[in-house]
Amino acid sequence: MGDTDVTSDANAPWLIVGLGNPGPEYARNRHNVGFMVADLLAERIGGKFKRAGKAQAQVIEGRIGPPGPANRRVILAKPMSYMNLSGGPVNALREFYKVPVANIVAVHDELDIDYGVLRLKLGGGDNGHNGLKSMTKAMGPDYHRVRFGIGRPPGRMQVADFVLKDFASAERKELDYLVDRAADAAECLVIEGLERAQGTYNS
């Protein structure tokens, strides 16, 4: 698993990882909401994703927060390895940019939370999420998560079918607002800390 320093350092960069699957056929799937949030954060920073060498990920480097001590250096990342292999690219980026595990934020879909509800936390289990499972295997569980609720599949629909389908038409009416809110939550976590972000965004 390698050296996985979990101690947050005020001067260390932050790595915000949007989890998803690469390719246009997955772009609007429920499972790709992490990519949607990462894309919005990229727009805010004002950069374009570029290939990260051998890390099998797309990245943008930038800064967020007001001038002064609260200004943070961030790396936005979208693993290009498919969801269940996300840990390898994320850990490679962590090592390359010297990011403490505690300075990593994974933005991902969450089945056990109602649609659009956010829950922020540090550490914990993977709750059956293959992207988190891969990350935890690569570097341990002590990273932050922005969990974006997608709810459970209706009736007898299989979970795999549900997460790999696009959001329903009724859900899409709110999706832009909810993705914007999740991006705000990730920024707040990095700039002001987990407790403040939880108090503001945990629904």
Swiss-Prot record:
GO terms of biological process kind: protein quality control for misfolded or incompletely synthesized proteins; rescue of stalled ribosome
GO MF annotations in UniProt: peptidyl-tRNA hydrolase activity; tRNA binding
Active site per the UniProt annotation: 31
Pfam families: Pept_tRNA_hydro
Record's catalysed reaction(s): an N-acyl-L-alpha-aminoacyl-tRNA + H2O = an N-acyl-L-amino acid + a tRNA + H(+)
General function of this protein: Hydrolyzes ribosome-free peptidyl-tRNAs (with 1 or more amino acids incorporated), which drop off the ribosome during protein synthesis, or as a result of ribosome stalling. Catalyzes the release of premature peptidyl moieties from peptidyl-tRNA molecules trapped in stalled 50S ribosomal subunits, and thus maintains levels of free tRNAs and 50S ribosomes.
Quaternary structure (record): Monomer.
Stated name of the protein: Peptidyl-tRNA hydrolase
Organism: Streptomyces avermitilis (strain ATCC 31267 / DSM 46492 / JCM 5070 / NBRC 14893 / NCIMB 12804 / NRRL 8165 / MA-4680)
